[in-house]
Amino acid sequence: MTNDSVPAKVMEIVAKQLEKDQKEVTPESSFANDLGADSLDTVELVMALEEEFGTEIPDEEAEKITTVQAAVDYIQNKMDDGKIKLEK
């Protein structure tokens, strides 16, 4: 997986976790306001991202990830820092 493929993968994970059609999920989508996620949904979503990308997202960082784009940015920044290495 490359840095460029992260947005599509994040949107796929969000759609699956929140049981939404992928067409409903955009980079600007807010998990709570646009996609109807509650706090438990958000925790499960962060866990799914951690599992997919092989990283740990600290709680203080997870609280800042409220949109699809915020999740993409977080993952891409970790990749740029060399903290996530993807071979998929």
Curated annotation (Swiss-Prot):
Q: Which residues carry this modification: O-(pantetheine 4'-phosphoryl)serine?
A: 39
Kindly list the places in or outside the cell where this protein is found, as annotated in its UniProt entry: Cytoplasm
The Carrier domain is annotated at: 4-79
Query: Which domain of life does this protein belong to?
Result: Bacteria
**Entry comment on modification after translation:** 4'-phosphopantetheine is transferred from CoA to a specific serine of apo-ACP by AcpS. This modification is essential for activity because fatty acids are bound in thioester linkage to the sulfhydryl of the prosthetic group.
Pathway listed = Lipid metabolism; fatty acid biosynthesis
The answer on whether this UniProt entry bears the keyword Lyase reads: no
Q: Which UniProt keywords apply?
A: Cytoplasm, Fatty acid biosynthesis, Fatty acid metabolism, Lipid biosynthesis, Lipid metabolism, Phosphopantetheine, Phosphoprotein
Q: Which GO terms describe its cellular component?
A: cytosol; membrane
User: What's a GO biological-process term for it?
Assistant: lipid A biosynthetic process
Q: Where are the transmembrane segments?
A: none
Citing just one GO molecular function, the answer is: acyl binding
Keyword Phosphoprotein annotated? yes
Record family assignment: Belongs to the acyl carrier protein (ACP) family.
UniProt cross-references to NCBIfam families, sorted A to Z: acyl_carrier, PRK00982.1-2, PRK00982.1-3, PRK00982.1-4, PRK00982.1-5, PRK12449.1
Instruction: Please give the function described in this protein's UniProt entry.
Output: Carrier of the growing fatty acid chain in fatty acid biosynthesis.
What name has this protein been given in UniProt?
Answer: Acyl carrier protein
Which organism does this sequence originate in? Trichodesmium erythraeum (strain IMS101)
What are the leading ranks of the lineage?
Bacteria, Bacillati, Cyanobacteriota, Cyanophyceae, Oscillatoriophycideae
Point out the gene that encodes the protein. acpP
